[in-house]
C-alpha cells in the first residue's frame, strides 16, 4: 500500500468521525432541551402535589393527636413534653427522636407522602423518573384495594390449586409485584378474528363415518335393546348414529387397529365409546355424560386423529393447532397427552402439553415448528395466544375442540376464559364436551356454543324413571294374590272417585287376561282387556274406551309394555312378575310419563327367584328400605339364592323380552317334559337325544386362568371353526355377544382364521382355526357365559338341521 492510498483511507475515517460527532452534538442538544422541559413539568407537578399533601397532613395531624391522647399513660416515661406531630424541633432531644412519628399509616396507604426539604433533591438525584414513580404508586394503591380481583384474572394460567391459594393472599402481602400483575391483566385478551374476511380458509370434512351394513339392518327396537344393554344409554338429539360393538365397525386404519388390539389390548368398547365415537366421527357436536374412568379419552382421541389425517397438513408458515383439548387441571392434561402420544406415534401427527408451571420457552420453540394437537389448561392457552401480539398461534386452523371434565372447568371458575377461547375459533368447528355431570352453567354454555348437539348419557340415572316409585308384594298362593288385587282396586276406585287415575294390569298370558277380566267383572270391577288374540278392531276400541273412562283399568299382556303413552296412568300392576330386566323396565315405564308421578307394583310368587333378583337390581335403596320388613327379608333370601345359582350355573337370567317365537315354544316344551321326567322319576330314553346334542356337534372349549399382578382372569377358548355355519353365526352375532356380556360381564374376542372342513393350518406360522375367547373376573361368570353360548350354538344347529330337511337333503 503506497502513501497516497494510506492518506485517502485516513481522510475517509476523519470525515466519518466528524459526521458522527456532528450527529452526537445534535442529539445531545435535543436531549438537553428535553431534560429542561421535563424539569419544568416536574417542578409544576411538585408544586401541585405539595398543595394536596398539605391538606392531607391536616387530617393526619388530627388523627395523630387523638392517638396520642389515648396512649398518654403508655408514653409518659418516654417523653417529657408534648411534641408536635410534624415540623421541626427546637431542642436536641427532639432532633434525636425526629424519625419517630405519632401516626403510622398502614402498608396499603401508599398514597400518603410527607415532603421534606430534601425531597426535591432526592427526586432529581434519583435515577428513576419521579412522575413515573408517582403513577406506579397510584397503581399500587388501586391494586391493593382490588387484590383479589386482580389475582382472580391472573390465576387463569395456573391450575385450580394455584389459583385458589393465590386468592387467600392477605392485604399485608398485596403491594408485592403489583405492577407486574397490572401488566399481566392488561395483556390477556385474545385478538378477535372476523372469519368472514379470512381468505383461503380450509373447508372442513367432518363426516368421516360410514355405517356398517350389519348395523344398517338393525331395527329401531334392536337399537333400543342394544343401548339398554350398554349401561342404559340415553340419547338426546336428532339423527344419532347407531352404537357400534366392535372396533372393526369404525373403519380405523390398520396401524390404529394394531395399536388397539395388540399394544393397548382393548378387547371391547366401553358403553360411552360404543355410542360417542360414531357420533363424533359423523361430524356432530357431542355432549358425553359418563362417570370418570369410562374410556372417554379414547372416545375423543380416535375421531380427533382421524379428522387431522383427513385435513391438509400444516404449511411451513403455520404453527397450528388443528385440535385443541382443554382440561381443568395440569394432571389431567398430562394424562391425556400420554394417551395422545400413543395414537400419534408413527402417524406424523404432533402433540404438545401446555400447562401452567411448565417451561414456557421450550413450549414456544416447539410451537414455532408447528403442532397438530395442543392439550392445555385455559390460562396457559390464553398466554400462548397473546404472546408476540397474538402472532405465535393462529386459531384459524382449529377445527376440533374437546373439553374434558367440562363441569369442573366451570366449577373452578374457568368459564370466562373458555368463552374467550371459543369466541376466537372458527364458527364451523366441531366441539365435544365430556363431563360427569351436566350443571346449569354447562347447559347454558352448550346452548350458546354447540350446534344441534347429541347428548349421550351413560348410566347417569337408574334404569327406572325417577318419577316412578317401585313396590313389591310376595305371595305364597295364587288365590291370595287375586284377593289382594281385588282389595287394592276397590280401595283405589273409592279413593279417587271423581278423579282420573288410570291403572294398567300386566299379565303373563292371553288366557289369564281373559280369566282375570271375568273374575273382576263378577266382583263389580269393569276392565278393558287387550291381547294379541283379540281382533284388531276390538283392541283399538277397548284402548279408546280405557283412555276416555275416568279411573279406567286396562288388563293386557306384553303387547302394550312398550309404546303406550297415557299420561293419566298412575299405577302399573305387574300381576305376573317380569322374567327379564328389559321386560320389567318397559313395563313399569307405562306410568310416570313426562313430569307425572306413578307407582309400579310387582306381584311375586315365592318360587319366582329370577323376578326377585330383577327387582333388587332395579329398585332404589330408599324403595327397598320402605318395603315391610317381612317382605324385604323374603325378597333378599330369594335374591341371594338366585345370585348363588347364577355363579354355579344352576340358574340363568333370560335375555331380551323372553319371546322367541316357535323356537322359544319348543324350548319351553322341552323344559316342561324334562321337569315331568324328573318329577315322576322317569329316565329319558337315550334314543330321544337328538343328533345336535351328541358329542359330534358338541361345543368344544378349553379353560384356564391367568395371573396378572394381584388379580386373576379366567378364560375359555371355544372352537367355533368346526361348527355348522348357522351355529357359528348364531354364537358370534352382535346381539348374542352383547346379551351374554350384559348378563355375565365377560369380554369376547374372536381370533384365528376360518378353515373349511378337512383343512387346517399347515405350520406354526399359519393362523389357528377360528376360535372365540371368553374372559371374566370370576370363574362362575365364564361358566355362565359358556352355558349361554352353548344354548345359542344348539339353537343354530337346530336351525341348520331344519334347513337341511326343508332343502330335501334328507329323504326317505
Curated annotation (Swiss-Prot):
**Ranges of compositional bias, category Basic residues:** 73-84
Compartment list: Nucleus
Q: What is the lineage of its organism?
A: Eukaryota, Fungi, Dikarya, Ascomycota, Saccharomycotina
Q: Does the record carry Transferase as a key word?
A: no
Please report the name of this protein according to its UniProt entry: Pre-mRNA-processing ATP-dependent RNA helicase PRP5
Q: Where is this region: Disordered?
A: 45-126, 153-173, 686-705
Protein purpose: ATP-dependent RNA helicase involved spliceosome assembly and in nuclear splicing. Catalyzes an ATP-dependent conformational change of U2 snRNP. Bridges U1 and U2 snRNPs and enables stable U2 snRNP association with intron RNA.
Q: Which UniProt keywords apply?
A: ATP-binding, Helicase, Hydrolase, mRNA processing, mRNA splicing, Nucleotide-binding, Nucleus
What catalytic activity is recorded? Answer: ATP + H2O = ADP + phosphate + H(+)
Domain observations = The Q motif is unique to and characteristic of the DEAD box family of RNA helicases and controls ATP binding and hydrolysis.
Native species: Kluyveromyces lactis (strain ATCC 8585 / CBS 2359 / DSM 70799 / NBRC 1267 / NRRL Y-1140 / WM37)
Sequence motif: DEAD box, positions: 404-407
Q: What is its main location?
A: nucleus
UniProt EC number: 3.6.4.13
Stated family? Belongs to the DEAD box helicase family. DDX46/PRP5 subfamily.
Q: Which residues form the Helicase C-terminal domain?
A: 481-639
SUPFAM superfamilies named in the record? P-loop containing nucleoside triphosphate hydrolases (SSF52540)
Amino acid at each position: 500500500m503506497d502513501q497516497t492510498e494510506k492518506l485517502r483511507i485516513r481522510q475517509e475515517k476523519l470525515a466519518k468521525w466528524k459526521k458522527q460527532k456532528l450527529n452526537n452534538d445534535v442529539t445531545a442538544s435535543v436531549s438537553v432541551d428535553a431534560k429542561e422541559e421535563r424539569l419544568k413539568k416536574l417542578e409544576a407537578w411538585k408544586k401541585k402535589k405539595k398543595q394536596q399533601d398539605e391538606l392531607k397532613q391536616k387530617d393526619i395531624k388530627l388523627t395523630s393527636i387523638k392517638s396520642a391522647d389515648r396512649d398518654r399513660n403508655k408514653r409518659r416515661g418516654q417523653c417529657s413534653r408534648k411534641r408536635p406531630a410534624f415540623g421541626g424541633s427546637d431542642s436536641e432531644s427532639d432532633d434525636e427522636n425526629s424519625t419517630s412519628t405519632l401516626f403510622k399509616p398502614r402498608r396499603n396507604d401508599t398514597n400518603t407522602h410527607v415532603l421534606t426539604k430534601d425531597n426535591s433533591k432526592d427526586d432529581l438525584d434519583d435515577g428513576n423518573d419521579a412522575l413515573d414513580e408517582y403513577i406506579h404508586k397510584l397503581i399500587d394503591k388501586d391494586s391493593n384495594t382490588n387484590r383479589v380481583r386482580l389475582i382472580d384474572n391472573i390465576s387463569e394460567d395456573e391450575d385450580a390449586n394455584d389459583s385458589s391459594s393465590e386468592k387467600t393472599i392477605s392485604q399485608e402481602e398485596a403491594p408485592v409485584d403489583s405492577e407486574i400483575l397490572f401488566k399481566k391483566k392488561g395483556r390477556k385478551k385474545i385478538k378477535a378474528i372476523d372469519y368472514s374476511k379470512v381468505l383461503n380458509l380450509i373447508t372442513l370434512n367432518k363426516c368421516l363415518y360410514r355405517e356398517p351394513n350389519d348395523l344398517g339392518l338393525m331395527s329401531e327396537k334392536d337399537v333400543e335393546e342394544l343401548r339398554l344393554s350398554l349401561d342404559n344409554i340415553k340419547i338426546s338429539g336428532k339423527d344419532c348414529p347407531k352404537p357400534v360393538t366392535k372396533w372393526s365397525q369404525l373403519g380405523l386404519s390398520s396401524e390404529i387397529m394394531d395399536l388397539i388390539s395388540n399394544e393397548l389390548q382393548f378387547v371391547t368398547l366401553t358403553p360411552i365409546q360404543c355410542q360417542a365415537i360414531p357420533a363424533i366421527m359423523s361430524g356432530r357436536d357431542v355432549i358425553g355424560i359418563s362417570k370418570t374412568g369410562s374410556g372417554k379419552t379414547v372416545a375423543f382421541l380416535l375421531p380427533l386423529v382421524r379428522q387431522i389425517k383427513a385435513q391438509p397438513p400444516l404449511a411451513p408458515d403455520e404453527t397450528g393447532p388443528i385440535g385443541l383439548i382443554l382440561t381443568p387441571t395440569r394432571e389431567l392434561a398430562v394424562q391425556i397427552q400420554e394417551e395422545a402420544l400413543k395414537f400419534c406415534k408413527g402417524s406424523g401427527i404432533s402433540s404438545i402439553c401446555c400447562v401452567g408451571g411448565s417451561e414456557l420457552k421450550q413450549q414456544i420453540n416447539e410451537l414455532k415448528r408447528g403442532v397438530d394437537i395442543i392439550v392445555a389448561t385455559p390460562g396457559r392457552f390464553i398466554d400462548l395466544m397473546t404472546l408476540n401480539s397474538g402472532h405465535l398461534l393462529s386459531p384459524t386452523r382449529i377445527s376440533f375442540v374437546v373439553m374434558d371434565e367440562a363441569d369442573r372447568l366451570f366449577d373452578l371458575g374457568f368459564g370466562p376464559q373458555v368463552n374467550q377461547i371459543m369466541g376466537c375459533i372458527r364458527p364451523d368447528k366441531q366441539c365435544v364436551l365430556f363431563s360427569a355431570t351436566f350443571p346449569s352453567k354447562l347447559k347454558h354454555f352448550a346452548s350458546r356454543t354447540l350446534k344441534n348437539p347429541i347428548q349421550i348419557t351413560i348410566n347417569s340415572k337408574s334404569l327406572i324413571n325417577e318419577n316412578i316409585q317401585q313396590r313389591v308384594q310376595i305371595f305364597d298362593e295364587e288365590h291370595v294374590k287375586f284377593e289382594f288385587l281385588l282389595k287394592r282396586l276397590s280401595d283405589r276406585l273409592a279413593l279417587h272417585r271423581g278423579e282420573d287415575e288410570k291403572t294398567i294390569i300386566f299379565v303373563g298370558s292371553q288366557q289369564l287376561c281373559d280369566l282375570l277380566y271375568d273374575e273382576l267383572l263378577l266382583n263389580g270391577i269393569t276392565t278393558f282387556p287387550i291381547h294379541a288374540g283379540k281382533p284388531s278392531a276390538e283392541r283399538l276400541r277397548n284402548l279408546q274406551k280405557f283412555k276416555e273412562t275416568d279411573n279406567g283399568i286396562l288388563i293386557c299382556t306384553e303387547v302394550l309394555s312398550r309404546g303406550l303413552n297415557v299420561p293419566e296412568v298412575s299405577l302399573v300392576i305387574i300381576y305376573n312378575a317380569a322374567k327379564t330386566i328389559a321386560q320389567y323396565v318397559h313395563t313399569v315405564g307405562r306410568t310416570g310419563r313426562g313430569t307425572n308421578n306413578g307407582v309400579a307394583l310387582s306381584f311375586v310368587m315365592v318360587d319366582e327367584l329370577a323376578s326377585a333378583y330383577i327387582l333388587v337390581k332395579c329398585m332404589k335403596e330408599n324403595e327397598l328400605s320402605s318395603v315391610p320388613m317381612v317382605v324385604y327379608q323374603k325378597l333378599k333370601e330369594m335374591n341371594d339364592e338366585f345370585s348363588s345359582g347364577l355363579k354355579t350355573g344352576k340358574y340363568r337370567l333370560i335375555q331380551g323380552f323372553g319371546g322367541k317365537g316357535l323356537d322359544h315354544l319348543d324350548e319351553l316344551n322341552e323344559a316342561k317334559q324334562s321337569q315331568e321326567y324328573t318329577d315322576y322319576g322317569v329316565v329319558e330314553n337315550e334314543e330321544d337325544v337328538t343328533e345336535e346334542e351328541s358329542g359330534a356337534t358338541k361345543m368344544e372349549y378349553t379353560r384356564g386362568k391367568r395371573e396378572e399382578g394381584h388379580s386373576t382372569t379366567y378364560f375359555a377358548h371355544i372352537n367355533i371353526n368346526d361348527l355348522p355355519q348357522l351355529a357359528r353365526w348364531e354364537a358370534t352375532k352382535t346381539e348374542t355377544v352383547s346379551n351374554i356380556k350384559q348378563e355375565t360381564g365377560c369380554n369376547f374376542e374372536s381370533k384365528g382364521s376360518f378353515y373349511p372342513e378337512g383343512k387346517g393350518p399347515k405350520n406354526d406360522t399359519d393362523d389357528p382355526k377360528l376360535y372365540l375367547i371368553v374372559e371374566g373376573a370370576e370363574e362362575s361368570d365364564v361358566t355362565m357365559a359358556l352355558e349361554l353360548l352353548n344354548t345359542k350354538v344348539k339353537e343354530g344347529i337346530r336351525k341348520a338341521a331344519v334347513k337341511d330337511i326343508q332343502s330335501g337333503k334328507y329323504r326317505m
